[in-house]
């Protein structure tokens, strides 16, 4: 095979891989080392992205190319990346999943990858390497995405990223968005956060999120409301319980005190992933009021800046309850 024929073959291969190839792939397809070096010269048509990883284009890499380059770099040296041998994890997975607090994929500065224990690959440039525990169940199976890249699930991505979370608020928001948006189940996320490395499970923001998830909190706004209620000395409510009226579904309020039959609804478009979610919140409050259950409404801003009136209203209702058809109301825990 001539160098030109090899280059044509490589171009076809590159088109299937977003123009990201390893040096081993180029050599395997007949591209001489001298040709590789020549095309990587300053001002040449190719660029070295990472050790052993080459982009068959010049210019800035797309978010997808960065992900593919990271997987290629972390693959066994001298081998083609094998499906599932290296997995994407961390913030890049969360951004690609569309979690609002993760930002746009193009804004992700560090690409996290997960490799089996015992592999000798160091973090480099924009790639941060995680190693699975050295046990038979350490390396998750992962899954192939629509774009052909292999990834862990959202729950595992959150657990791997937890030690590097810059702020507890963003981490709380991401975990809430993951559960609320049904990217993962609450029980799975809890298992990942608390069942991984001891150092990760002991982090204050991980403990905080685990506590909130355990009691059924699904948003930062609800978590902040809980803190306000605790500081005020109000009893702990149920969070996101499923209320039944005469055995039939009634509503899922943000917070509910079953002894007094009082509900708290936190009204804010900012904490709903879709406009329809906000409309459902309003409808939910109306259903509760139609059933003659008192509903206290508050916005996140109100709870942060002037929670006094909300606390006083709740305190009065809790002291004068139970209200409405309390003997006909039953409840179950929030979905897991």
Language model feature labels by segment:
Residues 2-4, 31-32, 179-336:
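Surface segments flanking catalytic/ligand-binding clefts of nucleic-acid enzymes
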